[in-house]
Amino acid sequence: MSGHTDADEIHEILRNSTTGLVHLKDYQRVKQNIVEKREKHALSTTSTKIKKRKDALSKKVKQGIKVNKGKLSFGEDEELENDDLPLKKVEKKMFMGKDPSADTSFLPDAEREIRENAKRAEYRKQWLKEQEQIREKEILIPFIYYDGTSTTYHVRTRLKDSVGHFLADMKQQIPFLKRILDMDKFLLVQSDLIIPHHHELYYFYINKVQGRDGLLFDFDKLSCSSPEMVATTQLPSQCIPHLVQKSYYLQNRHVFPCVHWEVFDSRKDYSLEKHATDPNAALFYRPS
């Protein structure tokens, strides 16, 4: 249809501007002019429509005019209505508020954290106070001086005392040992374990350190209310602390029971081991 219109228009132009036969080049030139003229006209028309559409939309946004849903429109009005759809969608968005029934306990709360930290600090302060009272409490416990035979004595000590201090108090209960001032010459042996001097008795209490026969130091069983109670205690000998001179240990470490003694290692689990026994070791467990 377009081709027929172009031919008629070309024929009309050639008839008005020429006479007789027309060369092919003249025909093509006239046709090209017509096509260019139409393209320019179409481009101009499109630009005008776009400008009108933008102006109308801008005016509508500024004035806040809403398009009626029931209105019928045609042509450009319909296009403008379609262009307005995103705007109407924005208007329909609902405001999202807080839900008062939602659980927010898991969310960070500065005030709650401050209260909890204060409670923890108070609990820790109370616990430290209780532990200090335990450390300061004086207890009476039995001990054995071992030099091949076993002699039972008793001594007052506190859990906060170091093993070295504990040995010094034990030594003071035995007259012929008082003159020895060098504490490195004495060992504390508990359940076949040589306890280093730097450890506190409280360490074994609070950590419930296990030996080969249960608690390494069972202070609840060791504690006595009086010296008379110490004399009648029925605790197994291996559960009672032993004061031993280092010279005796070095001379007899190849024989029972010294051969089984070893230095205590806090990283080791002694509950997995068994206490050494020897039917010929009666002297080691015989009270005097």
Curated annotation (Swiss-Prot):
The subcellular localization recorded is:
Nucleus
Q: Respond yes or no to whether keyword Glycoprotein is given for this record.
A: no
| Assigned GO CC terms | chromatin; nucleus
UniProt keyword list: Nucleus
Protein's GO biological process: chromatin organization; mRNA cis splicing, via spliceosome
Q: Cross-referenced InterPro entries, in alphabetical order?
A: FAM50A/XAP5_C, XAP5
Family classification: Belongs to the FAM50 family.
Please state what the protein is called.
FAM50 family protein C1020.12c
Source lineage: Eukaryota, Fungi, Dikarya, Ascomycota, Taphrinomycotina
From the UniProt record, report the name of the gene that encodes this protein. xap5
